[in-house]
């Protein structure tokens, strides 16, 4: 049994930031100076009025809390009302006004791989629903390189959320595995979110349209209170198509096509909750959530390796389905006098399916020896199915004590949490062929003793197989948190968490699942693939420390130290593959170590009746990044006269990386010094970071300098509101786009994005709502008002994903015209009607 542990103890070893970082920060000083110029006069005016207001001042991007506690440093919280106002259609819309957060795009089949923050993305940023981690992406180099798998992250409908919490920076103490760069947590709605105070029931309906991708949204539901019971039921449906951007020209089969692949999708989601509250101390609740997303596409821009298709048709057709069902039951006890202030227990079960279907008609070139012409003979249809099933079961117990007074050491609240979870993962592949007789010389084809006329269907053959046995991963986590008030103005949080992971497989099914690979390799010597049973133990310690000094409501300063880790997922660590043509190997690596991250962050916040502000500076260190290593093996076969060289790839722990950056946000309320401007507010948010790996390569997930400036006016009694945003999308410096590539001979190359690809852009959005009476709200927005053609860095860096990287030189040669299908949306309208009863 293998046994490995890692401890985040190198936090304070003083890693040196390269001097080049300092030289490149001049470009951001102007932004910081502008914020300070706006901030200083407002602060001086506000100090005299700080006790005269009861209004809550929130930065829309970052909620500023001036309470006497250690606040959540690096936290962005979007409320349900903010989500309604901004009308997000997907992950991209959810973070469009958060310059410090991006999205991860798969580069194939339109999949969203999750979020990007603090220089990392996808599986390195955890996603949770009500604090329960969601499945990560289980993908491998074989399927991702040809776009043959459903590589999207299971999404959550934001309209079913009461709030969305985005915690930037290493967060494994709270979220566990995968929170290297942060966590995105969706808090689901409760019955009281739909019920107006004083009523016993409520209902909600929403019909919306978003021109970005021709999205039609329908939402409906209701909630009720009856005696000690609370009930909620919500359902959503979304139908849409591919992004409507600046793609142009004729749709052709070409990796650099200027047209986007046609896509249609439908997504349904349901949320049901039932709670029994006998008194103020006890609460029982049951919850059910389900989401089913189906997407159909014609793939014109990714060429399969094993099919010759006809001109005028796509390379292949695809159908992807993402389905998840989640059920949970919880109990909560609260008391104002007992030693245990709060006791919470939760049982959770979830099953998720990620299915990908790919099919194409394939042809054989037929050359006329007399005139040299070539025709294509239809040889049949080929289907490839790939299915992944992920089952999660979880038990969690959490206990909070009342305040414990320790004299000069202050008051302490302790939290103890333990979690046990079990993940079951399995994948299956099915290849189906429907061949057609295509022997033009004889006019017939003999197959398995039967004669088929030219063009006749010759039946169906199917092969089912898997590259991995079903795998189980058990996780036990124990954490202790001390939330201490050392004085009225000084607070401290200290937390420590330990996670144990035990991974095993179903070895009894080895012959059924992986036997055919063993058959292919039985005579190949030197290709060391590992088919032994899996029995692996890994462990990790996570830490959290927050020291907050809050002398005034208008000035709070906090320092945060936190760590993160990510245990290699199943496909990364155990997937292995052998291809006879082209000949290459994918080798597993059972010795992979968990990835680790360390976050240091200093944050200054404050609020008055005139403003709310936030400035955060951070340094992140990452270690043991898991990346692909390519090489060549020398293998032999008994019937071969000489050895041959066989290319291989495998995952290894290779790079370390570091990142420095800042986030800033400011909200101004000019009516504090000019009552005539009541209802007017000004906002601005900015972010910049720069990172580099130990190999000298850039951290491509790092967002370039970005920001926005907003102007809002809210009418009396919040009956109507209009918002205007100017968005600044600055170009990524060429020096920060360095990455590895390989030439045709397999030699490593260092590349950078062409300067012509990297351009600044400025866009404008206007969105508003108007309430008709107390039950109806009209919402509308126009985005990219001046129809600006531009790319965000998230659009460009998907060229380095496995499905596109092998052809990136074609994009570089063709120039910006080859990027048309990756552009951001054209000017579009978003509108909705809401009814609240």
Feature roles, as predicted:
Residues 48, 261-267, 281-340, 351-369, ...:
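Flexible loop and strand-edge segments within Gram-negative outer membrane beta-barrel domains
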Residues 57-194, 602:
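Acidic, small-polar-rich N-terminal luminal/periplasmic segments of exported/outer-membrane proteins
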Residues 146, 159-168, 173-247, 254, ...:
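Outer-membrane beta-barrel translocator/receptor signature
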Residues 200, 214, 221-317:
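Periplasmic-side early beta-strands and strand-to-turn transitions of outer-membrane beta-barrels
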Residues 294, 300-307, 353, 455, ...:
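Surface-exposed extracellular loop regions of Gram-negative outer-membrane beta-barrel proteins
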Residues 309-336, 467-471, 526-542, 546, ...:
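Outer-membrane beta-barrel signature, preferentially recognizing the C-terminal barrel domain
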Residues 487-488, 492, 618-622, 626, ...:
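Gram-negative outer-membrane beta-barrel transporters
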Residues 623-624, 628, 680, 730-744, ...:
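C-terminal beta-signal and adjacent terminal beta-strands/loops
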């Amino acid at each position: 049994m293998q046994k490995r542990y890692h401890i985040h103890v190198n936090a304070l070893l003083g890693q040196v930031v390269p001097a080049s970082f300092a030289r490149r920060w001049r470009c951001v000083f102007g932004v910081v100076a502008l914020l300070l110029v706006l901030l200083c006069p407002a602060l001086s005016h506000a100090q005299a009025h700080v006790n005269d207001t009861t209004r809550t001042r929130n930065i829309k991007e970052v909620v500023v809390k001036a309470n006497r506690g250690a606040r959540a440093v690096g936290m962005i919280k979007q409320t349900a009302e903010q989500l309604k106002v901004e009308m997000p259609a997907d992950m991209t819309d959810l973070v469009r006004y958060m310059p410090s957060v991006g999205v991860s795009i798969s580069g194939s089949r339109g999949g969203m791989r999750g979020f990007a923050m603090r220089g990392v993305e996808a599986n390195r940023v955890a996603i949770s629903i009500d604090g329960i981690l969601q499945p990560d992406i289980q993908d491998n180099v074989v399927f991702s390189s040809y776009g043959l798998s459903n590589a999207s992250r299971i999404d959550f409908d934001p309209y079913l959320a009461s709030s969305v919490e985005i915690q930037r920076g290493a967060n494994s103490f709270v979220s566990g595995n995968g929170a290297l760069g942060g966590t995105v947590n969706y808090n689901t709605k409760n019955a009281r979110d739909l019920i107006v105070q004083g009523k016993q029931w409520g209902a909600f309906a929403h019909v919306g349209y978003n021109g970005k991708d021709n999205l039609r949204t329908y939402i409906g539901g209701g909630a009720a209170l009856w005696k000690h019971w609370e009930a909620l039921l919500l359902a959503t449906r979304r139908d849409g198509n591919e992004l409507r951007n600046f793609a142009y020209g004729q749709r052709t089969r070409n990796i650099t096509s200027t047209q986007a692949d046609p896509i249609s999708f439908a997504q349904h989601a349901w949320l049901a909750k039932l709670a029994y509250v006998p008194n103020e101390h006890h609460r029982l609740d049951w919850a059910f959530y389900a989401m089913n997303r189906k997407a159909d596409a014609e793939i014109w821009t990714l060429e399969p390796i094993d099919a010759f298709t006809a001109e005028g048709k796509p390379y292949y057709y695809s159908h992807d389905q993402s389905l998840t069902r989640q059920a949970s039951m919880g109990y909560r006890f609260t008391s104002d006098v007992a030693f245990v202030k709060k006791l919470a227990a939760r049982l959770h079960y979830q099953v998720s399916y990620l299915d990908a279907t790919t099919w194409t008609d394939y042809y054989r070139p037929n050359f006329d020896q007399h005139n040299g012409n070539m025709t294509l003979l239809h040889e049949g249809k080929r289907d490839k199915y790939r299915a992944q099933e992920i089952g999660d079961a979880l038990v969690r117990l959490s206990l909070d004590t009342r305040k414990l007074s320790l004299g000069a050491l202050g008051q302490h609240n302790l939290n103890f949490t333990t979690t046990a979870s079990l993940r079951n993962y399995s994948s299956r592949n099915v290849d189906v062929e429907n061949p057609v007789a295509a022997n033009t010389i004889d006019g017939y084809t003999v197959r398995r003793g039967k004669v088929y006329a030219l063009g006749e269907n010759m039946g169906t053959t199917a092969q089912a197989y898997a590259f991995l046995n079903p795998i189980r991963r058990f996780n036990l986590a124990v954490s202790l948190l001390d939330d201490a008030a050392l004085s009225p103005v000084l607070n401290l949080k200290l937390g420590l968490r330990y996670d144990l992971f035990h991974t095993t497989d179903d070895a009894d099914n080895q012959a059924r699942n992986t036997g055919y690979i063993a058959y292919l390799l039985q005579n190949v010597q030197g290709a060391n693939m590992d088919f032994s049973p899996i029995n692996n133990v890994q462990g990790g310690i996570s830490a959290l420390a927050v020291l907050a000094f809050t002398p005034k409501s208008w000035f709070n300063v906090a320092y945060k130290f936190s760590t993160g880790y990510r245990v290699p997922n199943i496909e990364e660590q155990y997937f292995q593959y052998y291809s006879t043509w082209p000949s290459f190997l994918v080798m597993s690596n059972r010795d992979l170590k968990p990835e680790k991250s360390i976050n240091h962050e200093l944050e200054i916040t404050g609020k008055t009746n005139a403003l709310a502000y936030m400035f955060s500076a951070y340094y992140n260190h990452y270690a043991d990044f898991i990346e692909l290593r390519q090489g060549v093996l020398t293998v032999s076969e008994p019937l071969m006269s000489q050895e041959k060289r066989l290319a291989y790839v495998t995952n290894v722990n290779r790079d370390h990386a570091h990142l420095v950056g800042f986030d800033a946000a400011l909200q101004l309320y000019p009516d504090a010094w000019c009552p005539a401007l009541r209802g007017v507010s000004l906002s601005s948010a900015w972010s910049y970071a720069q990172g580099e790996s130990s190999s000298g390569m850039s951290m491509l997930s790092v967002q370039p300098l970005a920001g926005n400036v907003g102007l809002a006016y809210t009418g009396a009694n919040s009956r109507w509101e209009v918002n205007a945003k100017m968005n600044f999308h600055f170009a990524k410096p060429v020096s920060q786009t360095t990455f590895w590539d390989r030439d045709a001979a397999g030699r490593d190359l260092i590349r950078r994005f062409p300067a012509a690809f990297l351009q600044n852009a400025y866009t404008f959005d206007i969105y508003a709502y108007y309430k008709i009476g107390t039950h109806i709200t009209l919402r509308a927005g126009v985005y990219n008002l001046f129809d600006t053609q531009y790319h965000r860095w998230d659009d460009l860096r998907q060229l380095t994903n496995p499905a596109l990287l092998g052809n990136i030189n074609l994009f570089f040669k063709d120039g910006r015209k080859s990027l048309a299908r990756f552009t951001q949306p054209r000017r579009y309208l978003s509108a909705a009607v809401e009814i609240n009863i």
